[in-house]
């Protein structure tokens, strides 16, 4: 795990088993993934009682065609978090959004939002395996789908 708690991710390229998400290049997770691109992602649906764990290998994209394509599809209102002066997780003496006062509301243009591109990254995660766990009072069920070796297995929960 790379402390990706709360991040929403979308499967962007099903034929190649890729999950991708956006991050700030200054985020701690970037340095962690540079040192070790292997990560795990855990998803849980309380209503369905299903837990899914992905084991992935991550590639960090920054200032390349992949980031440019994703950036161009991002609404300018969503680009706001990449305009902060200091990186995510930087300690502050006061409550702050991290934005310059003139950007601390929604009154900025798409052109002004372009400044955030320098901090924008796309992390593409190649799924190596999927573990599925169904939690049931009558007995749990668990399976592993190994995408690297095309091998599926039932597991004891």
Predicted regions and their residues:
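ATP/adenylate-binding site constellation spanning eukaryotic-like Ser/Thr protein kinases
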Residues: 6, 38, 127
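A general, composition-driven signal for non-globular sequence regions
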Residues: 1-2, 23, 54, 73
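A structure-centric signal for secondary-structure junctions around beta-strands
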Residues: 4-6, 16, 119
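Charged, gly/pro-rich active-site loop segments
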Residues: 51-157
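A short mixed-secondary-structure module that forms the rim of ligand-binding clefts
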Residues: 12-49
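Single conserved hydrophobic/aromatic residue that forms the stacking wall/gate
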Residues: 1-6, 11
């Amino acid at each position: 795990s790379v402390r990706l708690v709360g991040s929403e991710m979308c499967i962007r390229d099903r034929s190649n088993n890729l999950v991708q998400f956006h991050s700030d290049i200054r985020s701690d997770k970037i340095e962690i993934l540079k040192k070790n691109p292997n990560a795990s992602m855990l998803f849980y649906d309380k209503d369905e009682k299903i837990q899914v764990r992905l084991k992935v290998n991550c590639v960090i994209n920054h200032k390349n065609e992949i980031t440019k394509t994703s950036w161009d599809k991002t609404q300018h209102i969503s680009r706001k978090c990449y305009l902060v002066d200091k990186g995510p997780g930087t300690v502050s003496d006061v409550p702050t959004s991290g934005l310059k006062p003139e950007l601390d509301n929604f009154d900025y243009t798409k052109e002004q939002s372009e400044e955030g591109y320098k901090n924008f990254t796309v992390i593409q995660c190649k799924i190596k395996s999927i573990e599925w766990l169904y939690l049931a009072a009558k007995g749990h069920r668990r399976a592993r789908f190994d995408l690297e070796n095309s091998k599926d297995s039932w597991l004891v929960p």
